[in-house]
Amino acid sequence: MLDNAIPQGFEDAVELRRKNRETVVKYMNTKGQDRLRRHELFVEDGCGGLWTTDTGSPIVIRGKDKLAEHAVWSLKCFPDWEWYNIKVFETDDPNHFWVECDGHGKILFPGYPEGYYENHFLHSFELDDGKIKRNREFMNVFQQLRALSIPVPQIKREGIPT
């Protein structure tokens, strides 16, 4: 039992929360060529990446310079990408936000036919005074495989009541 816990709600650090939320909202609403400047929202040694991959290990891009390079790659491979149905959630830590959203656009990976990619995403943002320290993206990797015309194995789940 937590009888010594003092409930604060999310009324603490109001200005810090506002500043951090503004950064998260800006990140999620950046489109087109403006994506080439999104790395400016990070601290110098910040990182971002995809935490759900076909290998089971995250793809982590570390540092502003590498994040800038990643933006060039991303714009080439996902030229018209946009996030939508964006919902931003605060946590008990004013420096940690979660986002749930959908995303869609062309997918142009070398070696694969052009595809159209749609998925549902979760993003974790850890921030420091309005700058992103770490952004982790989570999605259903099978949807990306389908968009690339890669056959997806089917799992038999007999007996699950639906």
Swiss-Prot record:
Q: What is this protein called?
A: Phenazine biosynthesis protein PhzB2
Tell me which Gene Ontology terms the entry assigns under biological process: phenazine biosynthetic process
Glycosyltransferase is among the record's keywords: no
Per UniProt, the keywords (alphabetical) are: Antibiotic biosynthesis, Virulence
What's its job?
A: Involved in the biosynthesis of the antibiotic phenazine, a nitrogen-containing heterocyclic molecule having important roles in virulence, competition and biological control. PhzB2 (operon phzA2B2C2E2F2G2) has a role in the biosynthesis of the phenazine during both planktonic growth and biofilm development, and in host infection during biofilm development.
Q: In which pathway does it act?
A: Antibiotic biosynthesis; phenazine biosynthesis
Subunit comment: Homodimer.
Entry's induction text: In liquid cultures (aerobic), phz2 operon is induced by quinolone signal via 2-heptyl-3-hydroxy-4-quinolone (PQS). In biofilm (microaerobic), phz2 operon is induced by quinolone signal via 4-hydroxy-2-heptylquinoline (HHQ), a precursor of PQS.
Q: Which InterPro entries match?
A: NTF2-like_dom_sf, PhzA_PhzB
- What top-level branch of life does the organism fall under? Bacteria
- Xref: Gene3D superfamilies: 3.10.450.50
Q: Does the keyword Transport apply?
A: no
Q: What is the lineage of its organism?
A: Bacteria, Pseudomonadati, Pseudomonadota, Gammaproteobacteria, Pseudomonadales
> Which Pfam families would you find in this protein's record?
PHZA_PHZB
Species of provenance:
Pseudomonas aeruginosa (strain ATCC 15692 / DSM 22644 / CIP 104116 / JCM 14847 / LMG 12228 / 1C / PRS 101 / PAO1)
> What is stated as this protein's family in its record?
Belongs to the PhzA/PhzB family.
